[in-house]
């Protein structure tokens, strides 16, 4: 068996085309979707992520605003900028790129963003709504995974799903979304005993731990759907400098029925769902204007 590849680039391009049409319709009605991005410090990876988000906004017809702060900025200055953006009716989404320098309390910063502009889906109120199965802005990576499962024709209801990783950004919300969709979900992590026992039971396996090529083919149930959220740059060996996921793609593809590659899998859909949340926020504003 050789797995079918679930192409995140192709799906992302299709969804972004639809979002561009929605953004254009909003602009014609006098509401141009707008995303404000705050970047603190000079983390190279964060800078790349922000550039990619801004570029994606431009292509989709979404206005973007970028605010850069030095790494040693007083936290109060960033909080003041968030308050300013919260009050700006022309801004529909506010995003603070993580991680933040040590002088910041990340939870306080995320809570400072108005719920209706929290297009990253990290505000506690949005997380609470998600846990209750209520309408909310969904965290972008788990939301993107669900869209990929849907596009791949994967039956989630009744499936055994295993999530490797319990982060607030991916693991926990991923488990909630799968639960809300009717899957029986197991969350595994660094303290899990006999991880492979759990992964071999999974009809749907989501890896999100940040360990390169950690999940190997012998840990996967034959015919399983494997979603690789990880993105790691190898630092040694013949593949040094290359990007890879948390799954050993070569061995996994011989066991799984469907698998996402890295790069070109979940990553593009993460940014696409950020655009989707921003457009949805703008549409809510447009509806409120009648």
Swiss-Prot record:
UniProt feature coiled coil, ranges: none
Pfam families recorded: THF_DHG_CYH (PF00763), THF_DHG_CYH_C (PF02882)
Highest taxon of the lineage: Bacteria
EC number, as in UniProt: 1.5.1.5, 3.5.4.9
A GO molecular-function descriptor: methenyltetrahydrofolate cyclohydrolase activity
Gene3D superfamilies: Leucine Dehydrogenase, chain A, domain 1, NAD(P)-binding Rossmann-like Domain
Keyword Zinc: no
Reactions this protein catalyses: (6R)-5,10-methylene-5,6,7,8-tetrahydrofolate + NADP(+) = (6R)-5,10-methenyltetrahydrofolate + NADPH; (6R)-5,10-methenyltetrahydrofolate + H2O = (6R)-10-formyltetrahydrofolate + H(+)
GO BP terms in the entry: L-histidine biosynthetic process; methionine biosynthetic process; purine nucleotide biosynthetic process; tetrahydrofolate interconversion
Amino-acid biosynthesis is among the record's keywords: yes
InterPro entries assigned to the protein according to its UniProt record, in alphabetical order: Aminoacid_DH-like_N_sf, NAD(P)-bd_dom_sf, THF_DH/CycHdrlase, THF_DH/CycHdrlase_cat_dom, THF_DH/CycHdrlase_CS, THF_DH/CycHdrlase_NAD-bd_dom
Keywords of the record: Amino-acid biosynthesis, Histidine biosynthesis, Hydrolase, Methionine biosynthesis, Multifunctional enzyme, NADP, One-carbon metabolism, Oxidoreductase, Purine biosynthesis
Pathway: One-carbon metabolism; tetrahydrofolate interconversion
GO cellular component: cytosol
Binding residues for NADP(+): 165-167, 190, 231
Subunit details: Homodimer.
Protein role: Catalyzes the oxidation of 5,10-methylenetetrahydrofolate to 5,10-methenyltetrahydrofolate and then the hydrolysis of 5,10-methenyltetrahydrofolate to 10-formyltetrahydrofolate.
PANTHER family: C-1-TETRAHYDROFOLATE SYNTHASE, CYTOPLASMIC (PTHR48099:SF5), C-1-TETRAHYDROFOLATE SYNTHASE, CYTOPLASMIC-RELATED (PTHR48099)
Family: Belongs to the tetrahydrofolate dehydrogenase/cyclohydrolase family.
Protein name (database record): Bifunctional protein FolD
Lineage, uppermost ranks: Bacteria, Pseudomonadati, Pseudomonadota, Betaproteobacteria, Rhodocyclales
